[in-house]
Amino acid sequence: MKKYLLWMFAAILTSGLIVTTLTACVNDDNPSVDPVVEDVDLKDPLTIEAVEDGEIDITMEVVLPEPVYYSVNGGEKQEVSLYDPHDPQAHPYTKIDVKVGDKVQLFSRNTTLSKDRDNNNGFYISFESECYVYGNVMSLISPDDNWKDNREIKEPYALEMLFYYTNIVTHPTRHLRLPATKLSKGCYVGMFNSSAITDAPELPATQLAELCYARMFTDCPNLKKTPELPATRLAPRCYYYMFWACRGLTEATELPATKLEEECYAYMFCWCEALTKAPKLPATTLAKDCYAYMFGSCVSLPDAPELPATQLAEDCYSYMFARCKKITEAPELPATTMVKGCYSGMFSETGLTKAPELPSTQLAESCYEAMFSYCDDLTEATALPATQLEKRCYSYMFTHCGNLTSAIELPAEELPERCYNSMFFKCFKLSSVKCLATTMTGNYPLMSWLKYAGTDESVSTRTLTHAPETPWVNSDEDSTGLTDWFVPTGWTLVSL
């Protein structure tokens, strides 16, 4: 049978995608159809489309190696002017008047739009009237005009603050593409900071760079959910403040990384007041400040995620859930060896009613400092079995826990610097403490430790049980010296 070769092309534009159908008829009886899907948003340059009459302003405060161009409705390319603050006649930005439906496209052969961070000078696009933003952002930072295929951002802070304070609205079918899979330090820092964006663009990179997404969506009140974040290889501060104060955010994506980096998630969802579910946190290798303030002030978050790590890092959980008022139960904390500041402020101002078990006998400086401070609903403390203390280890641990009533036992004999400093300050309902200390080895270990404790009208007696021959006395003065064994007036001293 005679063979025929027939090539037929058809292009269908649907939801921002071009579907090209290639039909190859090998013979009359066996045709084959192989659809090839292309993303029109990758093939189009960065485009700003006016939803209403207004103006688009482009501010270029930095001298770049190559000019930045724009075109309106596919017309002739025009150069964005450089703002010279020393020229009294210079206009601070390039003003583009637009009507509904006008499209402004942008191009540049530079590798970065940020060359003068030391003087806070950069490149910004702004518009107060509503505009769609779609197309490929790489049209702004591709030196070989290869932006359609470019997947690498080469220089630091390349697109920093690009759409700061803009009135972005979501196009019904088109999308903004950030296709880079190889990122640079701070490449997207503050990119949409304080903008009206409602749908975040896809972020396909699986290997991150330092500060790459830092403050990217900070204070974006209309953002409801995060984009997928598939990265498994993180970098220091990669998600730092990424969604800070996104007060409409209700959904957070999975965070699959098991090895963390310094401050990688620090402040990531802080002040996301509508967030109701935390992502799973499977990491077992932690880093300094990795979760610091991650969910701070997430006042609608009812449950803390599981925390499986058994080896901690300095300040790793510092203030992680601070001011999460709806969290009433702490996750299990399986680590037995503490690190400096590891749990400091972790549950401060939460709704906990009972402290989790803290089995460690190997403490570290500030390891439990302010851990449960201002937990007004906390009524039950936990056993503190450590007999060897460290500087500030329990400092402010239960301060302002006004409903704490359970008896406290403190078995350590030596008290280092500030170890019990303000530990039970304003625990108004606390009535019983057992302290076996016999020696102070550092300054201020008992500073304000029981100040105002047990002063609620419901408390009839207050008792401090102590080691024999320790010279405790009742005094309302601050304990500052190594011999100031002070307990407030009204407490009964009972020697073992």
Residues covered by each model-derived region:
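Bacterial N-terminal signal peptides that target proteins for export
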Residues: M1-A11
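C-terminal motif of bacterial Sec signal peptides marking the signal peptidase cleavage site
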Residues: T20-A24
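Solvent-exposed loop and capping/linker segments of extracellular ligand-binding repeat ectodomains
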Residues: V26-L496
